[in-house]
Amino acid sequence: MVVMGDFNSTPDSAVMEFLLKSQISTEHGEFHGLKYHGFLKKANGECLGNKNGTKFFKHNFRLKACYTDDLLDELKYTNYTYDFKGILDHILHCKDTLRTVGVMGGIDVDWMIKNKIIGCPNVHYPSDHLPIISELELINPNTR
């Protein structure tokens, strides 16, 4: 399974924590005042409790990001606008069946600065989101 797109979520967000760790506390700070609880409960069934009584939402997909922490230094932005520059787009895959072979590097920030590009879209980039690409390969089930 591959999940990819504009998540409007930075790598350190609750959304990414939930997707990559397969669970998140129902009391996570990013959920306060928002109506995620009802949606996640409908989508997920029920919460699980841990030994401290804290409740968690969980999913059974074992996902991994193609652009892992060690590559995030290379990928500075997937969204480059006048007032926000950061990573909002992601490619995730099931870690049991797929492996990341390679990823495309990010934009040349020095080139953007040198050419006085303060945001996208512009004549060089038609969207505020910049492309990301990953090459994946199937993991042979006999070698797992």
Language model: regions and residue ranges:
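Metal-dependent phosphoester-hydrolase catalytic domains
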Residues: 1-2, 7-144
